[in-house]
Curated annotation (Swiss-Prot):
The name this protein goes by in its record: Succinate dehydrogenase [ubiquinone] flavoprotein subunit, mitochondrial
Lineage, highest ranks first: Eukaryota, Metazoa, Chordata, Craniata, Vertebrata
Pfam families the UniProt entry points to: FAD_binding_2, Succ_DH_flav_C
Keywords: Acetylation, Electron transport, FAD, Flavoprotein, Membrane, Mitochondrion, Mitochondrion inner membrane, Oxidoreductase, Phosphoprotein, Transit peptide, Transport, Tricarboxylic acid cycle, Tumor suppressor
Oligomeric form and interacting partners: Component of complex II composed of four subunits: the flavoprotein (FP) SDHA, iron-sulfur protein (IP) SDHB, and a cytochrome b560 composed of SDHC and SDHD. Interacts with SDHAF2/SDH5; interaction is required for FAD attachment. Interacts with TRAP1. Interacts with LACC1.
PTM field: Phosphorylation at Tyr-216 is important for efficient electron transfer in complex II and the prevention of ROS generation.
């Protein structure tokens, strides 16, 4: 039986009385299980405490490890820990298969060599180049070397990959992928399940997770980390269904909450992509890294923002302007439509700016697929055919799809090393935060640097979700003593929740959120300029101040979505602040975004010339470095620091460092 399905039925079957006077007795009667598992072997050890507030009794739980988030990264970390014998909780604000991983379309990269000779070192080279040399090469080494085994593991779990005629996993071409270190032409490295790879991957991992005795806390909203003496000792969460507060104490905590795409007005992200983990880390006084690097996917449906996978171009689709030109030949003569995403998005924007856009407003371009055989479209791109008809009214076998770059992915996030350990930077040195890990889009390992290659995100999920579990298993044993917390731990989180629940200002949550999203869209888009960024900083800071004037309408605790959306808005605001202040401070153009007032990349050397005889620029005078951002929660003031990019690989004899160069496609 599905553990989470059992959860749902159990919750529906018995609803607790929600008056505060009845809570404590209800929790203690033992008539309702708090830990929902696959086979029901575990007994609840929950204890009720009123140390924080008599109005909000807190239910305490204890685990070896807690994973926050149940998308691809969270599920892989959770069942990896359970498989190793750890008593593991998985806290998720969504039913696992509703996580945003399900929306990924194109595929997952791995140098399997099923279509032609391939090598993971070529994949490594492409990823470093795609990152515009802001990626950490030790983490990229780890990810690309682990990629083939990770895909085979998924196949063994039952993931139904598309196949070649001889039964091998089918691999399509994807942007920025090459053979022989960029000298051997286009690589076919992207393993896929038609154009629904994320859907298949998430359901495969979810099905696998049900083999293990993991405790699921479904539709619980994580409020904050429980930090003591610089260590993470768990999380405090709100049960959305009944409004109860839960402290989940654990020796190790893994954040896998996804990205913060909803800081922007037009994006491919689900409405639940609200940067919850990123904000939790910020409130804990820890840094976030490289949040200014936001990826604009070249092909979102014009007017809707829905994703049209890069796999369309991998299958032979082409971008055309109003004159019918295949314009990418001008900007990327070799890769053309399969250049990296930053190159394609900027090229599309330039075509529109120069008057060659399509439609009455000349404000988009076309993605043409109707020159491809209908049988190929039906087999390789069935989801896109359906999406284009629903959201654009287009029959892809007869007419092109109107597309426009739209926010798609966050390269930045919580800084980690290649083992998934969350980092702080002290006196020029990286230090791990005891008990805290992160993976997936919430994390910044940094394998994507300033620009992610398509189909590396699903790879990131499974490789680093697994890495977190392995790293914890190396440093801890199941049943190790769980550190204690103060009796009033989480008090500030409950006070904040109460304040928002009874907020009676003048601004609706939806109104303030829309103002933030439109400001980010207009002030921090693909092309950026200093004066506009400065105006955006002032605007977002002002909007952050407006959080004090919010008005909520639902005062209850049962399924209070008004309260949950307001908590999510707080999280989005923290992400937006760090994004726009980091963007304003970075006086160069690197990766996804492009500064029109600083059009060149600023490295420690001028790599357009031989470096012999050049003097290396001091760290303070170049921008090949990671941004670390902190926010004063009370004032909204953003503080920026910087840490070096890691250029060494894990083993130089096995995988040589790729030295910086001027990127071209």
């Amino acid at each position: 039986m599905s553990g989470v399905a059992a959860v749902s039925r159990l919750w529906r079957a018995r609803r607790l009385a929600l008056t505060c006077t009845k809570w404590s007795a209800a929790w203690q009667t033992g008539t309702r299980s708090f830990h929902f598992t696959v086979d029901g072997n575990k007994r609840s050890s929950a204890k009720v405490s009123d140390a924080i507030s008599a109005q909000y009794p807190v239910v305490d739980h204890e685990f070896d490890a807690v994973v926050v988030g149940a998308g691809g990264a969270g599920l892989r970390a959770a069942f990896g820990l359970s498989e190793a014998g750890f008593n593991t909780a998985c806290v998720t604000k969504l039913f696992p298969t509703r996580s945003h991983t399900v929306a990924a379309q194109g595929g997952i990269n791995a140098a399997l060599g099923n279509m032609e000779e391939d090598n993971w070192r070529w994949h490594f080279y492409d990823t470093v180049k795609g990152s515009d040399w802001l990626g950490d090469q030790d983490a990229i080494h780890y990810m690309t070397e682990q990629a083939p085994a990770s895909v085979v593991e998924l196949e063994n779990y039952g993931m139904p990959f598309s196949r070649t005629e001889d039964g091998k996993i089918y691999q399509r071409a994807f942007g920025g992928q090459s053979l022989k270190f960029g000298k051997g032409g286009q690589a076919h490295r992207c393993c896929c399940v038609a154009d629904r790879t994320g859907h298949s991957l998430l359901h495969t991992l979810y099905g696998r997770s049900l083999r293990y005795d993991t405790s699921y806390f479904v539709e619980y909203f994580a409020l904050d980390l429980l930090m003591e003496s610089g260590e993470c000792r768990g999380v405090i969460a709100l049960c959305i269904e009944d409004g109860s507060i839960h402290r989940i104490r654990a020796r190790n905590t893994v954040i896998a909450t996804g990205g913060y795409g909803r800081t922007y007005f037009s994006c491919t992200s689900a409405h639940t992509s609200t940067g919850d983990g990123t904000a939790m880390v910020t409130r804990a006084g820890l840094p976030c890294q490289d949040l200014e690097f936001v990826q604009f996917h070249p092909t979102g449906i014009y007017g809707a923002g829905c994703l049209i996978t890069e796999g369309c171009r991998g299958e032979g689709g082409i971008l055309i302007n109003s004159q019918g030109e295949r314009f990418m030949e001008r900007y990327a003569p070799v890769a053309k439509d399969l250049a990296s995403r930053d190159v394609v998005s900027r090229s599309m924007t330039l075509e529109i700016r120069e008057g060659r856009g399509c439609g009455p407003e000349k404000d988009h371009v076309y993605l043409q697929l109707h020159h491809l055989p209908p049988a190929q479209l039906a087999m390789r791109l069935p989801g896109i055919s359906e999406t284009a008809m629903i959201f654009a009214g287009v029959d892809v076998t007869k007419e092109p799809i109107p597309v426009l770059p739209t926010v798609h992915y966050n390269m930045g996030g919580i800084p980690t090393n290649y083992k998934g350990q969350v980092l702080r930077h002290v006196n020029g040195q990286d230090q791990g935060v005891p008990g805290l890990y992160a993976c997936g889009e919430a994390a910044c390992a940094s394998v994507h640097g300033a620009n992610r290659l398509g189909a590396n995100s699903l790879l990131d999920l499974v490789v680093f979700g697994r890495a977190c579990a392995l790293s914890i298993a190396e440093s801890c044993r199941p049943g190790d003593k769980v550190p204690s917390i103060k009796p009033n731990a989480g008090e500030e989180s409950v006070m904040n929740l109460d304040k928002l629940r009874f907020a009676n200002g003048s601004i609706r949550t939806s109104e303030l959120r829309l103002n933030m999203q439109k400001s980010m869209q207009s002030h921090a888009a693909v092309f950026r300029v200093g004066s506009v960024l400065q105006e955006g900083c002032e605007k977002i800071s002002s909007l952050y101040g407006d959080l004090r004037h919010l008005k909520t309408f639902d005062r209850g605790m049962v399924w209070n979505t008004d309260l949950v959306e307001t908590l999510e808005l707080q999280n989005l605001m923290l992400c937006a602040l760090q994004t726009i202040y980091g963007a304003e401070a970075r006086k160069e153009s690197r990766g996804g975004p492009r500064r029109e007032d600083f059009k060149e990349r600023v490295d420690e050397y001028d790599y357009s010339k031989p470096i012999q005889g050049q003097q290396k620029k001091p760290f303070e005078q170049h921008w090949r470095k990671h941004t670390l951002s902190y926010v004063d929660i009370k004032t909204g003031k953003v503080t920026l620091e910087y840490r070096p990019v890691i250029d060494r690989t894990l083993n130089e004899t096995d995988c040589a460092t790729v030295p910086p160069a001027i990127g071209s496609y």
